[in-house]
Amino acid sequence: MAKEHIVLFPFMSQGHIIPFLSLAKLISERHPTYTITLLNTPLNILNLQSTLPPNSNIHLKSLPYRSSDFGLPPDRENTDSLPFPLVLSFYQSGESLATHFTHFVSDLTRQNHDTPPLLIVADVFFGWTAEIAKRLNTHVSFSTCGAYGTAAYFSVWLHLPHAETDLPDFTAPGFPETFKLQRNQLSTYLKKADGSDRWSKFFQRQISLSLTSDAMICNTVEEMEAEGLRLLRKNTGLRVWSIGPLLPSLPPNSSLGRSGRKSGMEVSYIMKWLDSHPPGSVVYVSFGSIHDTAAQMTSLAVGLAVELATRSCGHSGRRFGGNRNRNSNPNGVPDEFEARMRGSGRGILIHGWAPQLEILEHESTGAFVSHCGWNSTLESLSRGVCMIGWPLAAEQFYNSKMVEEDWEWGGTCEGSGGGVRSEEVERLVRLVTEDEKGSDEENEQYDEMIGGYEEKGGEGSLSGQLIKFIGMESQ
């Protein structure tokens, strides 16, 4: 007898793998008789093995991949270990998985009494999967970003409206005239895009193919992004399901990160350090694993150092807890800054992965300086920690714009992406921590939208949305 099977295929990046893994676990809980297979490259699958309990109905399957075939360093299968100049080649290498993906789906169908998977849910960065999966009438795209950010990202890459004007701001097609984007907020490669460059060709192809899907999943909450979801549905013409927040969960005192990565510093030491500081006094800083530059990190360090130096060491003093990916530019954060923080006891710098959820949940954490990746944005909101946005690339600028202007949950560093002055960092740390952006009432509102959404019952809950999605899209 054929078994119901759902295939999940995230792009090879932690920001994509984490919500896909959360989705797999949610489906597993709600549909324990289903088999769920999560596909990826060998090293990513190896890292994920520790995240699943024994006898799980979630299977991990690796597809052959050799990074050196694409001019990349050996054993580089994730953006977290990649210098930025190689990122586009890495993105493009994903399409080499097409043959292996086709063979996997064909073998799975044959082994399951010629019954194809109930659903194939693939990353929007793997838009090419639509051509293969739709032969079986079973393809759904998954945007691991929010609805607002996804809609803006799609519009800007598909139409390149900034290339048609010299003005400092512009409107994205499909958005109201009042919706303005700033040219200086765009990443360097997007500013230069003209439709014939490699970046444009990659994103326009993957987005266009994703739009041929039967439907799309978005990692968001209907009540939180009603307008963003309306725009995304209108602009794509797809059924868009808000299945979120897909937030990771960790067992207490775990030393492993959200996708099987070990913390760069003992979690117990970090928690002890946080315990030693007053509530709301710590500024947590963490960016994504790519895009950071030495100049940006120096501005950050100087700005934080000035803010720390102008405060007493008493209750009002700010503390710094930072995370620097071990593969980032080793000259990014000045050595003297790290030494000063360590010597004064007012700061720690974590090299490698940080236990972000535990840090954000701790009462000592009062602000979060972030690149505004969507996972970090959801985690910050759900833990009631205001954000200082330092967007660097992708849809991060649109997320930061929404955090500041729509939700009033923090501020954005002026000049993000193209360089930020240290004075701007100092100003925003003071703004968020002294003015206490994010009242108790707002905290409760976002906790209800995000933190409490999964606990609700009924159709509006996360589980309810998932049941409706699987029921409709598998018909």
Curated annotation (Swiss-Prot):
Any one GO molecular function term: UDP-glucosyltransferase activity
EC number of this enzyme: 2.4.1.271
Chain positions recorded as UDP-alpha-D-glucose binding sites: 144, 354, 356, 371, 374-376, 379, 395-396
Group of enzyme by EC: transferase
Reactions the enzyme catalyzes: crocetin + UDP-alpha-D-glucose = beta-D-glucosyl crocetin + UDP; beta-D-glucosyl crocetin + UDP-alpha-D-glucose = bis(beta-D-glucosyl) crocetin + UDP; beta-D-gentiobiosyl crocetin + UDP-alpha-D-glucose = beta-D-gentiobiosyl beta-D-glucosyl crocetin + UDP
GO biological process: carotenoid biosynthetic process
Transmembrane segments: none
UniProt keyword Transferase, yes or no: yes
SUPFAM superfamilies: UDP-Glycosyltransferase/glycogen phosphorylase
Pfam families listed in its UniProt record: UDPGT
Residues at which an anthocyanidin binds: 16, 394
UniProt keyword Protease, yes or no: no
Active site, UniProt feature: 16, 123
Domain of life of the native organism: Eukaryota
Family indicated by similarity: Belongs to the UDP-glycosyltransferase family.
Function: Crocetin glucosyltransferase involved in the synthesis of crocin, one of the apocarotenoids responsible for the color and bitter taste of saffron.
Full protein name: Crocetin glucosyltransferase 3
Species assigned in the record: Crocus sativus
Gene: GLT3
